[in-house]
Amino acid sequence: MKRNNLSSFYVSLWLLFTATMLQAVESAKGKYAQMLFNELFEDYSNALRPVEDTDKVLNVTLQITLSQIKDMDERNQILTAYLWIRQSWYDAYLKWDKDKYDGLDSIRIPSNLVWRPDIVLYNKADDDFSEPVNTNVVLRYDGKITWDAPAITKSSCVVDVSYFPFDSQQCNLTFGSWTYNGNQVDIINSLDSGDLSDFVEDVEWEIHGMPAVKNVITYGCCSEPYPDVTFTLILKRKSSFYIFNLLLPCILISFLAPLGFYLPADSGEKVSLGVTVLLALTVFQLMVAEIMPPSENVPLIGKYYIATMTMITASTALTIIIMNVHHCGSEAKPVPQWARVVILDYMSKIFFVYDVGENCTSPRREKEQEHRLEGGDMCRGGDGKSHLSSRNDDSDLKENLNGNWNKSFGVHGENVRENVNCCSCYKMLIKNIEYIANCVRDHKANRAKGIEWKKVAKVMDRFFMWIFFIMVFFMSVLIIGKAA
């Protein structure tokens, strides 16, 4: 028991001694750091370029880390990004011998105390010209200064929406010195591309790279070169949102348009369906126009909307024409022979359009009806002949009756005269029946003419329905193929 207490006592003493030594070291470090700071900045000025020889070029190493894409405003063509900007350079006046300061090799001081390169974003699209964030810099014993500063940048980005919503964008971030030329400050990119290791995944865009390229430009105003480093941010749009909210509804609505040809002409809704679909697509077109920049490049989905709206307009116009054909009455001319052969004989069989009571197993029904009608006409012709013969018989009968009337002047002659009057009544009845038969015959002919025109309209409906279905299908495949 005493042995355990003794060991615990020694452990406590060791921990106390270690903590005391660390505190002494820290206080010594702090003492040397304060001494070093006072000696370094006693005669230091951050207004001048920190080189011993003014003809010497000061190299500034630049590294960009992309943390997050905050916004991509396609309409105003502005990219808002959250960056970590690391700059490092050597200050010839901020060096020390670390052995004289108890091995102190680096200190952290506010960045506004040292000279800083005036590197700015050339293609900045922000109205706020605020100064850089005043974060600390790391100052090493050999004079190397490392300055890490966060920045929310708004840069101009030329947006090409030709393949929206399956588009890819390339946005440039160009950094360079605002006042120093290449003979005074040279910019060197530390990596061949921007650092994407800490990138927070965006819900709308995929990052496919951020290559960096150094450019040396000579402007017309000056003969000195001006270097800059351009980081090209390659973005690929995630199109699922736009597919389910803009493209897929448009495709479904487009397939509704050809069904207007399948509606019965007497329903009165054929034109209404086309106009309703056209208005729905107009709403989607306006939604796309609100988010796209007003440029001459029409997006792919916009072209699809325009093509679909043109197709629906054509289908509505054809529907109106076909409805006029459908409602041709007795005043219309008969169906032309070419239309009878092409539309009624061939196309009606291809598109399975038959009369009431007719199906695909009885294609000769019309011919049989024609044969029956011709037979009926022959019978009616026979009736006409019998009527003519009966009329001749009546005249013969009248002559005989007149002869008998002259021969006999008795009661028998009066009976014969009554028979003649009855024959006259029969003749009037026959004339009335013939008139009624002619009216019925004309009515049937006009009705058959209207039925033929209705069948022509129905065949045209089926024909254009399949034509427009094929057009919608190929348009949908075309837009998906272009996206791929």
UniProtKB/Swiss-Prot annotation:
Top-rank taxon, per record: Eukaryota
Residues glycosylated per entry: 59, 172
Secretion signal, residue range per the UniProt entry: 1-27
Subunit: Forms homo- or heteropentameric channels in conjunction with CHRNA10. The native outer hair cell receptor is composed of CHRNA9:CHRNA10 heterooligomers. Found in the stoichiometric form (CHRNA9)2:(CHRNA10)3.
Family: Belongs to the ligand-gated ion channel (TC 1.A.9) family. Acetylcholine receptor (TC 1.A.9.1) subfamily. Alpha-9/CHRNA9 sub-subfamily.
Protein purpose: Component of neuronal acetylcholine receptors (nAChRs) that function as pentameric, ligand-gated cation channels with high calcium permeability among other activities. nAChRs are excitatory neurotrasnmitter receptors formed by a collection of nAChR subunits known to mediate synaptic transmission in the nervous system and the neuromuscular junction. Each nAchR subunit confers differential attributes to channel properties, including activation, deactivation and desensitization kinetics, pH sensitivity, cation permeability, and binding to allosteric modulators.
Protein name (record): Neuronal acetylcholine receptor subunit alpha-9
